[in-house]
Amino acid sequence: MASPKEILVVNGREVAVSNPGKIYFPQAGYTKLDLVRYFLAVADGAVLGVRGRPMALKRFVDGAESEPFFQKRAPDNRPPWMRIATLTFPSGRTADEIVVDDAAGLAWVANLGCLDLNPHPVRAEDLDHPDELRVDLDPVPGVPWSQIRDVAMVVRESLASVGLVGWPKTSGSRGIHINVRIEPRWTYPEVRRAALALARDVERRAPTLATSKWWKEERHGVFLDYNQNAKDRTVASAYSVRPLPDARVSFPLRWDEVPLAVAEDFTLATVPAIYASRGDAGAGIDAAVGSLDALLEVSARDEAAGLGDAPWPPNYAKQDGEPPRVQPSRARRPAAEYEPGMGVDGGPPPDVAAERAAAVAAGDPNAGLPPMPGLPEGWQGTRPTPTGRRRSSIPVIEIARAASKREVQTGFERWCLRHPEAAAHLEPADVLTDAMRGRSSAWYRLRVNLMHVPESLRPTQEELDPDYDPWAAITPEERAAWEAAQAALGGRRPAPRSRPDD
């Protein structure tokens, strides 16, 4: 028996809604048809955020509580009036992506299970020059909402100082987004460079509230994710619905609303009435086009002062001028910080290597090494054999890998039960949950920073629980082909993140 459908006529075009009664938000009781009707109620504002922009389809086909999959290639059975644009990804591959231009297109993608819409910051007519700089305020765990709002106001000041206008909106999740309309005459790397300069300027203005540090283990407060402006990165657009139990919405705000705004106030149920009564707070964005020249001058001053590039996302080829792409907890420490006798690769410093080798051969195992603390001068004995291992400056261990966030959090709960004394010392920011990028879907890992745990209580690295392998369903031939493609583009390994390359 065929699944029931509801046919909607939107701007003279028929859009079929399959399984209209399917529950998408179990706790709130909202159905797929409710989702489609919501988007139609805010269509002018929602289309403004995506019009003319290619987008990947993030599909929650079994509702908000299911794991989404990302479909970059436009479905073959799309309606003839749905536009596409051909994008080239960092991997070198291409795909025809959907371009939504009107309310009918909005309803059509909603029927596919797209709760949040993820357009690129470029228009289909010019895929190499973004016309939008995106500021993503991403709080570390435990940061209060009030602090995120405070940082947003600092961003406004920083933008104004370089002649730019920001358009804020709640992310619908934990943060705030601020979009900046710019002239489409800069490349992706140049826009990212400007975003990094902005992040650093905000950090200078509010050093206790904000950070531009890429590595999670170094962050505090609210992170300004400058890498959201790298090519192929996207953020949820205005009026997107997020996969949370209350069907929260990414809602545009006026600047005078930001200091008192509460993210939970904006949901699938409440936003249509708010929108009907006050309109779209972001409606003027296309009339506020700005230049990046002044912000790029800030970047040039930073670089002249020795503040160069910052790390790129792991799936990008190594960039000119980029610092080593190594987590601080895994970085090799300067020679002066090594323990006595721990030279490069586990040997002594090169200038005494030959002397020490000769002395050891002559029967003195401690030749060339300083006395061990607490032992009398001239003591002869044996020292532990150097292992060549680095001593991490930040003690981070990995707890779990899984296909869903819920599974890694459950694994972390089991770890806490095994190590209650260590768990008692953890702060919210010490628990690092990362959305990783698989070949065709997202997966998750959870790590713990033990910096606040006394050394005597720090557990060692254990087997992961659970230990998910994102490649388990991939044939050896497919994996080899994928790795070869990454190696050809800068020696990269498969580096999962939250969205696939192809």
Give a label for each model feature:
Residues 98-171, 182-190, 348, 354, ...:
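Signature for HUH/AEP ssDNA processing cores
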Residues 48-50, 159-165, 206, 420-426:
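Short secondary-structure junctions
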Residues 163-168, 209-211, 427-432:
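A short linear hydrophobic-aromatic micro-motif
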Residues 338-502:
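Acidic/polar low-complexity segments and flexible, solvent-exposed patches
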Residues 66-120:
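A contiguous, low-structure linker/loop signature
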Residues 58-60, 166-172, 212-216:
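Short beta-strand
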Residues 1-29, 36, 47, 51-52, ...:
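C-terminal accessory nucleic-acid interaction domains of nucleic acid-metabolism proteins
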